[in-house]
């Protein structure tokens, strides 16, 4: 087992050493990804496709969350010190999470808060590490320089904030893969003309504050002492300020990492860089303060703790247990939002350089800070917690592998048997989804097995009702001349989304076949209002004896 390489008094300038500190702590590793994307974006995306981030984030993001949990909950001393956060605020977050599963409005606002807060959290970490390196190297940071440095990081975040909240955001920052039909990002809705003015103002102020910071710091120090902080300032610019302004203005779109087209993909790399950076500093802190004897043991515990934090709510609140929203239709998003917001709040409470113990470890070079208090806890609680974390880790690995190989890739080659096997396995671990049964139903229809198709359509609806499943089930019934059942299916689809023009056309056909002429006409008129340029609909309305033009609509 490798031990943590704590700095000695002869090398107080680094935490682990120049290579790892610059690569992982300051962000040069991400700069390498940025450079690779610039010259070979297609090859990078082919080598590391976006679907692979499910497992990548498991390995890196889970211990990143787990490290915070260990920092706050493992020691009795810390549990007592942060009772407000560890008990009361945590309970409040759990309450919002549970409520959001039954309220799409609250869930959407919750997800929006998480996405909006994420770059602020990243920016705060970059700023804190920049100050840490300056102070470890004995650089005198006069108040004005510190204020300008802080303002520079805030302004770079503000650029992303405006991008998020101008209409529908497409900047793609944030560590989650947004997958779901129940929840959406809800932007404030900044008007475009106002956003353009804000971009110009924020961009100008960002350049001024950054230049002022560099000027004031350079007056009393040298490049060698300023190096790590300068790299962190550059990382912040590459993460937020430069891509935010480039995408907003439509400039530099030929550079892949700055393009709107690759924003979601590059945003995942930024999230990974942040998680690695966090693990880098927390691993150092744990070795010095919490007496962990080895890096491997500490990171394993962090991985299990993070896996439990993600896995337990996802399993308990899956459909069939305590929840009603499938994993890939909103539950994942709500778990991600809650776990991350909990992490953000705890981080804001525990990582303060004005904390004497924290400052002694991160800002000084002495090797010991005194013994920790007893961690306490029942003898059976800890093994149970680690076992739970291990089970959740296995569930994540199995779930992600089955989703990628048993569903996505099997679907590409039309392998219904493999998808069916994956569906059964995913259902056992709380990841049953109407999309899986819907896909099996469509494949059964393709093969002419309409009995099996109907079974899978109904299985999909038992998991979670969606407009697409109801529509396709109704279409199958219509082709079988089961008009009563078809009309019922179309009505259910329209109850979920009244704006489905094609569903209304099919419902009209079913109603007319049942002799319900007025109902058929009503559906056609509603479809014509949704598709005012469709002359075929108007002809059918006339054929049924209706008005040629829907009310309020003129012929083109």
What spans do the regions from the language model cover?
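Residue-level recognition of tetratricopeptide repeat
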Residues: 408-411, 442, 475, 509, ...
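Register position in tetratricopeptide repeats
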Residues: 446, 479-480, 513-514, 543-547
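Short coil turns that delineate tetratricopeptide repeat
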Residues: 428-432, 464-465, 498, 532
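Helix-start (N-cap) detector for alpha-helical repeat units in TPR-like alpha-solenoids
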Residues: 434-435, 450, 467-469, 483, ...
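Hydrophobic alpha-helical transmembrane segments in integral membrane proteins
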Residues: 390-417
């Amino acid at each position: 087992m490798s031990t943590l390489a704590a700095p000695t008094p002869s090398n107080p300038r680094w935490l682990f050493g120049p290579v790892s500190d610059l690569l992982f702590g300051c962000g040069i590793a991400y700069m390498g990804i940025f450079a690779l994307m610039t010259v070979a974006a297609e090859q990078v995306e082919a080598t590391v496709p976006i679907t692979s981030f499910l497992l990548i984030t498991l390995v890196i993001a889970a211990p990143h969350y787990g490290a915070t949990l260990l920092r706050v909950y493992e020691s009795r001393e810390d549990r007592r010190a942060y009772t407000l956060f560890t008990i009361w605020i945590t309970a409040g977050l759990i309450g919002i999470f549970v409520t959001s599963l039954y309220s799409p409005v609250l869930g959407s606002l919750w997800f929006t808060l998480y996405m909006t807060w994420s770059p602020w959290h990243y920016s705060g970490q970059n700023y804190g590490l920049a100050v840490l390196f300056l102070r470890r190297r004995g650089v005198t940071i006069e108040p004005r320089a510190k204020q300008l440095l802080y303002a520079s990081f805030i302004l770079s975040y503000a650029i992303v904030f405006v991008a998020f909240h101008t209409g529908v955001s497409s900047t793609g920052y944030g560590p989650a893969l947004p997958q779901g039909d129940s929840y959406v990002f809800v932007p404030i809705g900044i008007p475009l003309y106002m956003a353009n003015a804000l971009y110009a103002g924020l961009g100008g102020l960002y350049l001024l504050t950054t230049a002022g910071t560099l000027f004031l710091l350079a007056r009393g120090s040298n490049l060698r002492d300023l190096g790590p902080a300068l790299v962190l300032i550059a990382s912040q610019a590459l993460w937020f300020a430069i891509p935010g302004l480039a995408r907003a203005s439509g400039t530099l779109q030929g550079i892949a990492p700055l393009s709107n087209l690759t924003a979601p993909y590059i945003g995942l790399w930024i999230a990974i860089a942040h998680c690695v950076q966090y693990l880098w500093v927390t691993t150092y802190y744990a070795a010095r303060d919490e007496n962990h004897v080895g890096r491997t043991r500490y990171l394993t515990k962090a991985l299990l703790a993070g896996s439990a934090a993600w896995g337990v709510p996802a399993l308990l609140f899956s459909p069939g247990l305590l929840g009603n929203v499938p994993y890939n239709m909103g539950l994942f998003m709500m778990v991600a939002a809650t776990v991350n917001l909990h992490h953000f709040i705890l981080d804001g409470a525990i990582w303060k350089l004005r904390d004497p113990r924290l400052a002694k470890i991160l800002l000084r070079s002495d090797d010991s800070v005194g013994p920790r208090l007893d961690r306490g806890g029942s003898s059976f609680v800890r093994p149970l917690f680690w076992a739970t974390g291990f089970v959740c880790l296995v569930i994540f690995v199995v779930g992600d592998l089955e989703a990628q190989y048993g569903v996505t890739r099997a679907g590409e080659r039309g392998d219904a048997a493999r998808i069916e096997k994956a569906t059964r396995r995913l259902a056992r671990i709380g990841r049953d989804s109407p999309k899986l049964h819907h896909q099996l139903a469509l494949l059964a229809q393709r093969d002419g097995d309409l009995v099996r198709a109907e079974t899978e359509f109904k299985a999909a609806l038992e998991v979670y009702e969606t407009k697409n499943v109801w529509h396709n089930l109704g279409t199958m019934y219509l082709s079988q001349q089961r008009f009563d059942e078809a009309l019922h299916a179309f009505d259910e689809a329209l109850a979920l989304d009244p704006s489905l023009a094609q569903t209304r056309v099919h419902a009209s056909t079913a109603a007319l076949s049942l002799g319900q002429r007025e109902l058929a006409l009503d559906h056609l008129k509603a479809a014509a209002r949704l598709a005012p340029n469709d002359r075929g609909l108007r002809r059918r309305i006339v054929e049924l004896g209706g008005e040629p033009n829907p009310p309020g609509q003129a012929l083109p």
